Curated annotation (Swiss-Prot):
One of its GO terms (biological process) is chorismate biosynthetic process. Pathway: Metabolic intermediate biosynthesis; chorismate biosynthesis; chorismate from D-erythrose 4-phosphate and phosphoenolpyruvate: step 3/7. It comes from Pseudomonas putida (strain ATCC 47054 / DSM 6125 / CFBP 8728 / NCIMB 11950 / KT2440). The gene is aroQ2. This is 3-dehydroquinate dehydratase 2. It comes from the Bacteria. Pfam families: DHquinase_II. Catalyzes a trans-dehydration via an enolate intermediate. InterPro entries: DHquinase_II, DHquinase_II_CS, DHquinase_II_sf. Keywords: Amino-acid biosynthesis, Aromatic amino acid biosynthesis, Lyase. Substrate binds at residues 75, 81, 88, 102-103, 112. The keyword Amino-acid biosynthesis applies. GO terms for molecular function: 3-dehydroquinate dehydratase activity. Belongs to the type-II 3-dehydroquinase family. Homododecamer.
């Protein structure tokens, strides 16, 4: 059985391709999901790719990942800067987490510079567009190979 990585996307990411394309690009969420699926397949991983605009739903998905998934790639969107609950759920999952952002949050408004997730993540990738998700999945493949050796 292939290791399962949960790829989570927070609020407004369903609007990719039409929302602020200068900031987030022209790729849609479906394009992003397909790129992640292709990368996962190439590395012998499976993914569950999800997006929600409801914080409690995201937390439920994180809770359900414990003991079932090998890791979590998460773009919490605006919740990055506001949600202690998501941070606590990620800690409770006891899974390695990679935080991803399409835009370089450090080149944007000061309130976007704070992340409640970064301090508990094994890595943070921002500003590389959808390539950041693929990099995160590639890293998980390497991490899992190292653990298996």
């Amino acid at each position: 059985m292939k290791p399962l990585i949960l790829v989570l996307n927070g609020p407004n990411l369903n609007m990719l391709g039409t929302r602020e394309p200068a900031q987030y690009g022209h790729e849609t969420l479906a394009d992003l999901a397909q790129g992640c699926a292709d990368t996962a397949h190439a590395h012998g991983l499976e993914i569950e790719f999800r997006q929600t605009n409801h914080e409690g739903e995201l937390i439920d998905w994180i809770h359900a990942a414990r003991g079932r998934c090998a890791g979590i790639v998460i773009n919490p969107g605006a919740w990055t800067h506001t949600s202690v609950a998501i941070r606590d759920a990620l800690v409770a999952s006891e899974l390695p987490v990679i935080e991803v952002h399409l835009s370089n949050v450090h080149k944007r408004e000061p309130f976007r510079h704070l992340s409640f997730v970064s301090s508990i993540a094994v890595g943070v990738i921002c500003g590389l567009g959808s390539h950041g998700y693929r990099m995160a999945l590639s890293h998980f493949a390497e991490l899992l190979q190292e653990r298996a050796a």
